[in-house]
Structures are given as C-alpha cells and as structure tokens.
C-alpha cells in the first residue's frame, strides 16, 4: 500500500511540469526544439541559495541554437529580454550589470552546461518571477515561472 502511494506521488510530480528545488538545486534541460523540460521551478524559501544547472541536450552550436536561463521579476521580463538582444552573443544576450536580472547562466550550445547560484533572499514570496532564454526569438517558447514556496 505504501509503495503504491509513493509511486503515485512520483508519477504526479513527473507530469506536473514543475521542478522542485530538491536539495536547493534545480536541473533544467534545453533542447534544439527551443524547449525547456519544465514550465515552473519551485524554490523552498528555507533555502539560503539555490543552484540552477542548465544542460543543453541538443547538438547545435550556441551561435545557431544557444540557450541560457535568465531569472527576472515578471514585470521586467520583456524589457530585460529586449535589452539583452543589444548585448549580443558575446554578452550572453544579457545586458551587462542589469539590476533587473536576479540571475542568469551563460549561453551554452549543444552538449554544454552551465550553473548559477541564486541568493534566495533576492526572491520575495508572493512576487511573480519569470525564467526565460534570452537568445533572440527563443523566449516566446522558452519561458516559465519561478515560485518561492
């Protein structure tokens, strides 16, 4: 009986489209079809910091199909995305020193990965946050929410 409940919980978490920051870290995959493997990242407020581990599971190079993961307040998402285009590939499509950016990984190509540590005290419970890929044109399909729980 207990094992069937555990299996049910595991299956529900697999199909929820959400990734819980187990152990205060999150593994997110991006692919050549311009998709992340999740639409939501749940962060426990008890974490002092959490790590976002981004892995590009595709094979295309970063100048063609590069991906990153940028976290901003949802209200700042579009402006940060637009300003990132001007930064170009050399700037990881993130404006240098942009205070609206909570955290971001570097731009990675197929088979590459990067990680970034996020100070959870910078995330306010109740505030809406968005994570997205700032490579030009990708954010329409590659974005989700960060929720502090």
Curated annotation (Swiss-Prot):
Places the protein is found: Periplasm
Domain Plastocyanin-like: 22-149
Keyword terms, alphabetized: Copper, Disulfide bond, Electron transport, Metal-binding, Periplasm, Signal, Transport
Any one annotated GO CC term: periplasmic space
Induction: Produced during both methanol and methylamine growth. The expression of the azurin iso-1 gene is affected by copper ions.
Main location: periplasm
Binding site for Cu cation: 67, 133, 138, 142
Disulfide bonds: 24-47
GO molecular function: copper ion binding; electron transfer activity
Pfam families linked to this entry: Copper-bind
Keyword Transcription recorded: no
InterPro entries, per the entry: Azurin, BlueCu_1, BlueCu_1_BS, Cu-binding_ET, Cupredoxin
Signal peptide, first to last residue: 1-21
Task of the protein: This methylothroph organism uses azurin in the electron transport chain involved in methylamine/methanol oxidation.
Designated name of the protein: Azurin iso-1
Organism this protein belongs to: Methylomonas sp. (strain J)
């Amino acid at each position: 009986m207990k094992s069937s409940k555990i299996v049910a919980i595991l299956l529900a978490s697999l199909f929820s489209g959400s990734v819980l920051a187990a152990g205060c870290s999150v593994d997110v995959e991006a692919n050549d079809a311009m998709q992340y493997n999740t639409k939501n990242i749940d962060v426990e407020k008890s974490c002092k910091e959490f790590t976002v581990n981004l892995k590009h599971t595709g094979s295309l190079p970063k100048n063609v199909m590069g991906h990153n993961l940028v976290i901003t307040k949802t209200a700042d998402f579009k402006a940060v995305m637009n300003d990132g285009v001007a930064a170009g590939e050399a700037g990881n499509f993130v404006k240098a020193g942009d205070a609206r950016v909570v955290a971001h990984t570097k731009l990675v190509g197929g088979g590459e990965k990067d990680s970034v540590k996020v100070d959870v005290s910078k995330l306010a419970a109740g505030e809406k946050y968005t994570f997205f890929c700032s490579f030009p044109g990708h954010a329409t399909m590659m974005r989700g929410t960060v929720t502090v729980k």
